[in-house]
Each structure stands twice: as structure tokens, then as C-alpha cells.
Amino acid sequence: MRKIVHVDMDAFYASVEQRDDPSLRGKPVVVAWRGARSVVCAASYEARIFGIRSAMPAVRAERLCPDAIFVPPDFTRYKAVSRQVREIFHRHTDLVEPLSLDEAYLDVTHAKTGMQLATEVAQLIRTQIREETQLTASAGIAPNKFLAKIASDWRKPDGQFVIAPSRVDAFLLPLKVNRIPGVGKVMDGKLAALGIVTVADLRQRPLEELQAHFGSFGQSLYRRARGIDERPVEPDQEVQSVSSEDTFSEDLALDALAPHILRLAEKTWLATRRTERIGRTVVLKLKTSNFRILTRSYTPEQPPTSQEALAQIALALTRRVELPAQTRYRLVGVGLGGFSDVENGAVQGQLFGQMPPLE
């Protein structure tokens, strides 16, 4: 039986800002550029009390908490701290799969320290992070990645939670289905319309029914409802692509997708900045009302150097969609692929310097 730990830094970017500037401690801090189309990168726990969350439009965050302190993100500092944390992980196992600067999966089945209990490994890792970075992390311990990720949210901030193999059903079945990664508001509503509110409800539905309603995602739902996730922890896997998607509550015409594409371009650009890598290929993904998926991509001579450039290419790709005008779409996604490392400071400044607003 595998022993998987999911470690997630607590309000990472905001916590780094509060650590480095004592005047920010205990105050609602929002890490974001100011601007009509900017989104929140991170919010301190003091800001979250007001309902502010990551990926929320910055203007909405200002309305929710007029006294919030907005701090522009500094990814160079965040990446330096992330390297510190990753070095701590590698003291315990070489099977480390980073998901972003602030979270990772670890397979500690055969920990380097010889420790047998995954809970003790997780506790030691969290203690070392606190002592060496003055930041806190939360951890989930479980037999697979899916369950470990859910568990890491259970005792946030600065806590850990274990789902023992013998307790998987007892933990999983009472959960609301929106606790399953990938089940957002729209999917949650569609499941509720079918009478599926909890994981126990979901488990009662046959695979064929879920696939009929949700296509390939139906199989994922079927497996997650049973706590099944056989994905291995893939050590230090380099990010090859980044994307953001929106599923609509009502199907839309192609010419109604532009506002969504603009917003998704910003989310994708922000996620790209977190990797500090260059994405060269722009990808537009669409799903029609009858679940047909199509993608269009374009690789310019020079990689996009701003969210505006990314958005304009994605918008242009809609003109390559050759379906009848009456076709309606239930999902749109914007992605960047073909990643390579940022090689020098000049290129990094050009790509990841000031983020211009989309007009």
C-alpha cells in the first residue's frame, strides 16, 4: 500500500509578503496587480474572512474589503522560497511531484529517513518548513494522490489529516461531490439535477450513466467515488502546458465567447508566470453542446510576451472554427504549451515583467 503526502503551503504568496514585511501581519493582504482585469493571486487568511479568494477579479476583492492591502506579486521571491521547501522534501524522498510553487505530492512509502509512519514524515516536513522558512504548511496523508489532496484541506491552516486505507469509505461517502477535484459550480449543479449531492449518491450510479451524461469525465467520477486513483507520483515533472477552462451554465454561441476567452487568457498567463517557463504554442479548446471536443492551436515565431498577446491569438483562433453558426458551446479553454525554461534575466524581464491590462 502506497503512502502519499500532499503538502500545500498556507496562503503562500500572501504569507511570504507578511513574513518579509511585519507591518502586513494580521492585516487583510491581497497579492494582485491593481486593474480592471487583474485577478487575485493569493489572499491572506485575514482577507479570506471577507470572502476574498484566489482567481477572483481584483475589483471584486476591493469591493469585498475596501481596507485590504494590495501587494504586487514578486515571483522571484516566491520561487526562492519554493526551492527551500523543495529541498526539504528531497531530504525525505526522491519521489516529489511539484504541482506549483506552493504544493507537491510526495511518495514516502520508502522514506529516506527510515521512518515507517507517513504521519510522522509529514509532521517532520512541516516542522522543518516552519523552522527554516518561518512559514506554515498543511498536509494530507492517504493511499493515493486524489485522497491526499482532499485531506490536505481538512486541517488548514498549519495542520495535517490522514485518511487510513481502512477509513476511506467512512471519510469519502458523506462528502459533498463538490469536494472532488474538477467538480466546480457548474458540474455540481448538473450532478444535483440528477439527484447526486454526496459521494454516496455518486457511487450508486453505474458507469454507463455517468459517461452518458459527462463523457470521459464520467469515468473519472466513477473511480473517484470509489477512492480509486492509481496515478504514480512523478518526480520533478516539468510543466509542459498550462490551461484554464470555463464550463457554462447555459450553452453559448461562438461570438459570445470573447469575454470568457479574455478572462481565461489572464488566468493562464498568471499560471504561466508561476512556472517561470516560456509557453510558445497557444491552444484554444471548445466543447460543443453535444460534447464534441475540438482544439485549435498556433505557434508564433516569438512566444507571447503578455496576457494581451495570448488573448489576441486565442481570439483569432475562434476564426478557425468551421462549424455551423448555430452550434452552441458548453466549455471554452485557453492554454499555453511547448514550454521551455527562461534562460536569462533579460528574457525573464521581457516575458514576466509588468503585466499589461487587457483593454
Swiss-Prot record:
It is found in: Cytoplasm. InterPro entries: DNA/RNA_pol_sf, DNA_pol_Y-fam_lit_finger_sf, DNA_pol_Y-fam_little_finger, DNA_polymerase-Y, DNApol_IV, IMS_HHH_1, Rev_trsase/Diguanyl_cyclase, UmuC. It catalyses: DNA(n) + a 2'-deoxyribonucleoside 5'-triphosphate = DNA(n+1) + diphosphate. It comes from the Bacteria. Its cofactor is Mg(2+). GO terms for cellular component: cytosol. Its EC number is 2.7.7.7. Binds 2 magnesium ions per subunit. One of its GO terms (biological process) is DNA-templated DNA replication. Keywords: Cytoplasm, DNA damage, DNA repair, DNA replication, DNA-binding, DNA-directed DNA polymerase, Magnesium, Metal-binding, Mutator protein, Nucleotidyltransferase, Transferase. Residues 4-184 form the UmuC domain. The record marks Y13 as: Substrate discrimination. The active site is at E103. Pfam families: IMS, IMS_C, IMS_HHH_1. Mg(2+) binds at D8, D102. Its main location: cytoplasm. One of its GO terms (molecular function) is DNA-directed DNA polymerase activity. Gene3D superfamilies: 3.30.70.270, 3.40.1170.60, 5' to 3' exonuclease, C-terminal subdomain, DNA polymerase, Y-family, little finger domain. Poorly processive, error-prone DNA polymerase involved in untargeted mutagenesis. Copies undamaged DNA at stalled replication forks, which arise in vivo from mismatched or misaligned primer ends. These misaligned primers can be extended by PolIV. Exhibits no 3'-5' exonuclease (proofreading) activity. May be involved in translesional synthesis, in conjunction with the beta clamp from PolIII. Belongs to the DNA polymerase type-Y family. Monomer. This is DNA polymerase IV. It comes from Xanthomonas axonopodis pv. citri (strain 306). The gene is dinB.
